[in-house]
Structures are given as structure tokens and as C-alpha cells.
Amino acid sequence: MIDIKLIRQNPDLVKEALRKRGEDPATIDEILKIDADWRTTITKTNELRSRRNEISKNVARLKKEGKNTEAEALIEEGKRLGEEIKALEEKEKELQKQLNDLLLMVPNIPHESVPVGEDESQNVEVRRWGEPREFDFTPLAHWDLGPAWGLMDFDRATKLSGSRFTVMYGKLARLERALINFMLDVHTKEHGYTEVWVPHLVKRETITITGQLPKFEEELYLAERDDLFLIPTAEVPLAALHSGEILEEKELPKKYVAYTPCYRREAGSYGKDVRGMIRQHQFDKVELVWVTTPERSFEDLEQLVKDAETILQKLELPYRVVSLCTGDLGFTSAKTYDIEVWLPSYNAYKEISSCSNVTDFQARRGNMRYRRRSDGKLEYVHTLNGSGIAVGRALVAILENYQQPDGSVRVPEVLVPYTGFEVIP
């Protein structure tokens, strides 16, 4: 949620930010109209309350002086004021709800360093690492390799759950688990993250804090009986962990890592990446979240990206980093880097991590603040999030980039201590 003060004081700046995102700036005019009405209603209510308090004092004085007729007249006026105040309080409450509902639909303001563009075609490549492998044989896609070994089963997954699910057996199941443990070890032992085990079902308020609600409810799985949502990413419980709390500056930054399955309906992605494991309704991910101060959050974002890159470098998988343009930014993000791994089956780089600084957007929704060391002033924290990394896509990248002419796949050296084997199958 962006600061209403920013909209009041600099509406043109906010409108321009929305235009750069490809959003309709008319929402801001609607917000300003309701906000003005809301503030006028508050002022009028306070004036009537003040008048009613004055009447109460005068009634007591007049009764003491024996002027009962005048006192009765004031009592009647006080009753009328009470009814007006009640009506205004109801109006104030309704306007506040309308205002809050609209504010929840306004995306974050892009940082000045974000390239301006309409869609992903205008994202800007920042750097590359490694070179895509040149095969001296025709490489197979992961959706051909896995089933050929009898270790990846899309048909039975469809029988169990419908499309966009996968069953894996034996060495592939162990490779998935090895990747999870490897990533957690790197981030906790080398990068200083605290590992967190989080719930996979969260309250409506929690997932509103992190920005998935109210705008993207159709993309979420909901357990209706208990009104609990399956998490689309561990960012949700991690970023909301300190909601309603005041932290001390000396505690920051807090760096959290969590492994969870993630659940997404993918309602808006019909027809995209329908083959294999690239776009699933359920997938594993290791997530990184920082809680930090405004002064250092963009510097911390650069470090977060490097932490995610380390995983791909250790796995020796070629990748590139791109800075998302304004039109491709996520709803909550002020700045995002995507890390894209090379996949031979697509002959292209595909996203394997998305790292974002959402500034105080989530902190305002969740009332997450910290006390400044210098003056004791309370300020909103900044939160960052990033995949460190998507496990299923890492497995896919290994299968496709490490395949051999005989149809086998060599396991990356760093994973052998975790898998206990060097070759698949």
C-alpha cells in the first residue's frame, strides 16, 4: 500500500508512475475525491462533537441556575446533534472502507532506476554468467528424458490431480530433495540466513499484507471452510512474520530462508509452458526474505540477487540477470531483477528466480515498523524477497544441460554428497 500522503501531496507523480506501469491513473482522482469527502466528514463530525460537549456543560450550568426551560431546549438540540453525529460516523466509516479498498488496488511506485517499458520485451539485460552448452548430439527436453527413464510421470499425476502436476520416482525424487538441502545449506552456512519453517495455509489478512489480495484472489487456492489460503510462495508467511511489531534498528537486517511447496492456480496462464515441469500448480521453492531499513534496501537487493546467483554458479548452470521494466513489474515491487537459466529445450533463458524490493509497500499494510537508533523515531521497514531458487526449474535445468549422448544425465559435482550418486538413471 502506498502512502496516502504521497497521493495527496504529489498526485501527478503517482499518476505518472501508474502510466509507466500501464495502469489507469483515473483511480488516483477517485481516491482524492473520496479522501476529501472523508476528511470533510471527520472535520464536521468533530465540530458537532465539540458543540455537543459545549451543550452538556451549558445544560449543567442552566440547571444549577434553575433555568430549566432553557436547559430542556439545549437537551433537545443535543439529541438532534447526537443523531447527526451518528449518521456522520457511519458515513465516515463507509468512506474510510471505500478509500482503503481503492488504496489496496494501487501498485507500488517504480524506483527511478527501473527502465521504462511496456512489457517483458523491454526488460534490460544486466549481465550473463556461463555459456550455453553446444551439444554434439540432439539434446532431449526434460519431458522426454524423465519419462524415458520411468522416473518422471505426468500421466499418473494427471490421473491423481489433473493437469500441471508431476510425480517423480527414485533418483529424480532424491535429486529434488538434494537440491532443497543444498540450497538451504548454502544460504544458512555461507550467506547468513536464518532458516524458518512456516505454515503453508495462511489467513486472509496475512496474504493481504503481502499484496496477493484483494487483486489476485483468482490465482490462489482457498480452503473455503476455514477461509485459509494455500501459499503461492513462502514470501507470504516470511514477509508478514513481523506484522504489527516494532523492531529495533540494531536487529536489522533480518534475513530469512524457507523451503516450501508453492501452490498457484495459474488462472491467467492458459496455454503457456504446458509441457513438462516449467509451469506447475504445485512446485518447490527456496525463498529468501529480508527485513531492512529504507536507507540500505536497494543495496541489500543487489546482495539478495548475488545470493540467488551463487546457487546457479555452484551448479554451473548458465544464466542471465535482467532488470524488469515498469510495464513488467509485479504489483508490489518497486524494483525487480529476474534471473533466467538457460534451457536447451526452449533454446532460451527462462526465469528461475525473481528478486524484488517492495520498499514499505507490505510494511504499511502489515504495520511493520522499526525504531531508529539515532532519534527513536518509528519508521516503516522495507521488505525484499527473492527465489533462492525455484527447485523444480533447477532440476529441469540440470537434466537438460547435463545430459549425455547415451541419454543419461551427470549430476553436478556439488550435489553428489547430497544425492549419493553421480549419474541418472
Swiss-Prot record:
It is found in: Cytoplasm. It comes from the Bacteria. L-serine binds at T233, A234, E235, E287, S387. ATP binds at R264, R265, E266, E351, I352, S353, S354. SUPFAM superfamilies: Class II aaRS and biotin synthetases, tRNA-binding arm. GO terms for molecular function: ATP binding; serine-tRNA ligase activity. It catalyses: tRNA(Ser) + L-serine + ATP = L-seryl-tRNA(Ser) + AMP + diphosphate + H(+); tRNA(Sec) + L-serine + ATP = L-seryl-tRNA(Sec) + AMP + diphosphate + H(+). GO terms for cellular component: cytoplasm. Keywords: Aminoacyl-tRNA synthetase, ATP-binding, Cytoplasm, Ligase, Nucleotide-binding, Protein biosynthesis. Pathway: Aminoacyl-tRNA biosynthesis; selenocysteinyl-tRNA(Sec) biosynthesis; L-seryl-tRNA(Sec) from L-serine and tRNA(Sec): step 1/1. Its EC number is 6.1.1.11. Homodimer. The tRNA molecule binds across the dimer. PANTHER family: SERINE--TRNA LIGASE (PTHR43697:SF1), SERYL-TRNA SYNTHETASE (PTHR43697). Belongs to the class-II aminoacyl-tRNA synthetase family. Type-1 seryl-tRNA synthetase subfamily. Consists of two distinct domains, a catalytic core and a N-terminal extension that is involved in tRNA binding. This is Serine--tRNA ligase. The gene is serS.
